[in-house]
Amino acid sequence: MLLRRGATEVVAVDVGHGQLAWSLQQDERVKIHDRTNIRELTAEMIGGPVDVVVGDLSFISLRLVLDPLLAVTSEDGDLALMVKPQFEVGKDKVGKGGVVRDLDLRAEAVRSVLDAAAERGWGARAVTTSPLPGPSGNVEYFLWLRHGPGSVDAAAVHDEVRRTASLGERSDKVGP
């Protein structure tokens, strides 16, 4: 999608190997960093800070990778991160089939990432529910972060989660 929308270069980072779609692997605008742990990523590894970071991570909390993600983002850059509650709330709070059904836990997951970003000087400009549920049926959320104070608070996160209580239900964006 980034390339279709005009990105001149995309840096793809994956701890695995060969996970990227074949057509993207063949695209000269895509710089692939397979077998790279995101926690060890530096701006030097990818040619300097970037203007936009898009994160869709699994099996790890975004709170654990915020520092390296922010370190590769330019001061006036943007982050669009997918918050997956099942990886944020802790294994003991995940329900049957790996799905987080409790609305308060979903909101807690988003707020925990929002709070971790705020502690580092980055604020949420918007939060919205993904129109597609995760493979197991989890409702997932996108956070848009920028350096400086955010315009999305805990109440807005709570409202967004409540508005989209049904799995896979699409919502309107919260924020500017």
Label the predicted regions:
Residues 63-80:
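A short glycine-rich, Lys/Arg-flanked "PGG" loop and its adjoining helix->strand segment in the class I
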Residues 139, 143-176:
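Flexible, glycine-/basic-rich loop-and-beta segments that form/coincide
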Residues 106-120:
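Short alpha-helix
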Residues 83-102:
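Short, glycine-/aromatic-enriched active-site segment of Class I SAM-dependent methyltransferases
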Residues 122-132:
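Conserved S-adenosyl-L-methionine
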Residues 20, 84, 137:
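Residue-level signal for inorganic ion chemistry
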